[in-house]
A protein has these predicted regions:
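Cysteine-centered iron-sulfur cluster-binding motifs in ferredoxin-type domains/subunits
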Residues: 94-104
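Conserved small/polar residues in nucleotide/adenosyl-binding loops
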Residues: 212-218
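Flexible, acidic/Gly-rich N-terminal and inter-domain linker regions that tether
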Residues: 1-90
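Glycine-/small-residue-rich active-site loops that bind phosphorylated ligands and cofactors
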Residues: 23, 99, 151
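Short connector loops/turns at beta-strand edges and beta->alpha or beta->beta junctions
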Residues: 200-204
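Conserved Radical SAM active-site core
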Residues: 60, 67-86, 105-198
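Surface-exposed cleft-lining segments at the edges of enzyme active sites
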Residues: 148, 205-211
Length: 220
């Protein structure tokens, strides 16, 4: 039965939900080109899928769908006092993506979101425009990979490269990028003092017992 159940799952991103208002957005088109076999489903709002009641997040993660959407407000959130700000002032975080391709058993996202699917906001330029206004009056420490692993999705989004290019032009901005990704997307980016990559490295034993499911070990 377990084997039958396993093969019945769709592959990741075999279904992509797209908000109608951003269907013709250039980034939407670029992303869809990467998944030519995906079934595209147009929706009015990402919450129509993501916030439905009675979803099984565990099973959904076995066949994760991608939801392309537009973020319209609350681009940046103040970090809670209990969160690690590493001594920096004006600590914020933002979510250009919600949910993660990894499936770590201890992750708080499992209890935070009602869905196991992934939301990607395609209008990152609106985040940067909002940041332009804030940086005129204060410095900022922003965690941009707080509710997802941006680096793990870099081949699809290119967002880490965009954030890095923005940080290079704004000395009063410091970015933190948390990741468990073993990809090489960051290696050809310039080394910037105000862009911090925070890696989680897990030994094989941790992965073997599924604490950090789908991540790569530190040893072959």
């Amino acid at each position: 039965m377990k084997n039958l159940e396993h093969v019945c799952y769709n592959t990741r991103f075999s279904h992509i939900y797209v908000e109608r208002r951003i269907r013709n957005h250039p980034r939407t088109e670029q992303i869809l080109l990467r998944f030519p076999q995906a079934q595209i489903v147009e929706i009015e709002h990402y919450k129509d899928v993501f916030n439905r009641h009675g979803q099984d997040c565990v099973r959904q993660h076995q066949a994760q769908a991608l939801i392309l959407a537009e973020k319209t407000d609350h681009f940046f959130y103040e970090g809670a006092p209990v969160c690690q700000d590493f001594g920096n002032t004006n600590f914020y975080y933002c979510s250009t993506m919600m949910n993660c391709i990894y499936d770590c058993s201890y992750c708080y996202l499992k209890g935070m979101y009602p869905s196991g699917h992934m939301v990607l906001f395609v209008n990152i330029e609106d985040y940067l425009e909002e940041l332009d206004h804030i940086l005129k009056t204060q410095n900022m420490y922003v965690c941009i990979s707080y509710d997802a692993d941006l680096l793990a999705m870099e081949a699809v989004t290119g967002y880490v490269r965009l954030w890095s290019a923005y940080a290079a032009k704004h000395e009063n901005l410091k970015l933190e990028i948390r990741t468990k990704c073993a990809g090489h997307a960051m290696w050809d980016l310039p080394c910037l003092s105000n862009v911090i990559y925070a890696f989680t490295l897990s030994p094989q034993k941790m992965i073997a017992v599924s604490y950090t499911h789908l991540t790569l070990p530190t040893n072959p």
